[in-house]
Amino acid sequence: MNYLIHQLLNAEEINLIKKELDKCSQQDWEDGKKTAGSHASMVKNNLQLNRNTEVSKKNAQLVTKKILSSQLIKSFSLPKKIHGIMFTKSSKNMHYGRHIDNPYMSSGRSDLSFTISLTNKDFYDGGELIIETMNTEEKFKLNPGEIILYPSSYLHAVNEVNNGERLVCVGWIESYVKSTEKREYLFDLDAGARSLLSKHGRSDELDLIFKSYSNLLRDIGE
């Protein structure tokens, strides 16, 4: 499965975000159906912070900055645009049924989807993220501050929360390379070249690999 899990936020950043979210009024938290497509809205049952609140805008900027500061995430996703960031919470009996993300949103194309956990996974029961491919189905329950990125073309769901509260940040990435398969080729090539660089230092042979990577990205990127 083509996904990446990475520690994005530290404990201090998580606590600051959660403190600001706690200050938001009940009116700031909207029915999650408001931003879902017509089909997905039929299976969506959660709350999301209004994107127009200052808390949402400020912390969306923080998340964007953190993503763009991660060499690993940039190599994996080749982000052209990070968009649609919002903070959502699911209390007891809330869930998000099996669905596919809209390919085009008002904020951009969805090539990769991401979820960042803001809650200790031991503080709620259920609420696992389910990601499906043609042959597999995997469940994920992230540690606080971890991000998972996966192709938006995958069917996915969030299991019902049985107890506690699941608080996450979600969003989408429009990539310079919209093909999942081609992104994987480039990611492997970049990872291999960087590993050789760290172990053996610069060489004429590595220059050729980095040259080929750059020209391949230039050729297939948008």
UniProtKB/Swiss-Prot annotation:
Cofactor: how and how many bound: Binds 1 Fe(2+) ion per subunit.
Binding sites annotated in the UniProt record for 2-oxoglutarate: 166
Keywords: Dioxygenase, Iron, Metal-binding, Oxidoreductase, Vitamin C
The protein's required cofactors: Fe(2+); L-ascorbate
GO-annotated biological processes: DNA damage response; intracellular iron ion homeostasis
A Pfam short name: PKHD_C
GO molecular function (one): 2-oxoglutarate-dependent dioxygenase activity
EC number: 1.14.11.-
Residues that coordinate or bind Fe cation: 99, 101, 156
InterPro entries per the UniProt record, alphabetical: Oxoglu/Fe-dep_dioxygenase_dom, PKHD_C, PKHD_hydroxylase, Pro_4_hyd_alph, Pro_4_hyd_alph_FE2OG_OXY
Residue runs in coiled coils: none
Domain Fe2OG dioxygenase span(s) in chain numbering: 81-175
Protein name from the UniProt record: PKHD-type hydroxylase P9301_13621
Source species of the chain: Prochlorococcus marinus (strain MIT 9301)
